[in-house]
Amino acid sequence: MALIRLELHEHPASPQHEMRQKSVLDSGGTVVGTVANLYVDEGSRQLRFVDVLTSEFLGLERKHHLVPVEAVSDQDPGSITLGVDQETVQSGPEFPNPHVAPDEDYQRTIREHYGYG
């Protein structure tokens, strides 16, 4: 499916999917990172992936990891909670260029990593 990255002034189709700048917690409540970007279906504007900016190696190394929206298990005003642990997020493929929407092969790889393939 064709995806686009939402610009800061754009919003997903469902207001409850506005997650940018929220803290990201894993299934055990550990802070994994922050929501950096949202990727939506180009036609419907439905949220498909959340770009999680993680801090690894004592917070010195920051990486982008895409997470399928299906992995978001809860949300409150300041954070989202994933239904997976920190290791699952950090062991996923790094998203090398968060300024460009992921192609279909990369989307498939990410979905398979999280068990949604």
Task: Put a short name on every predicted segment.
Residues 1-117:
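Peripheral interaction segments used for macromolecular assembly
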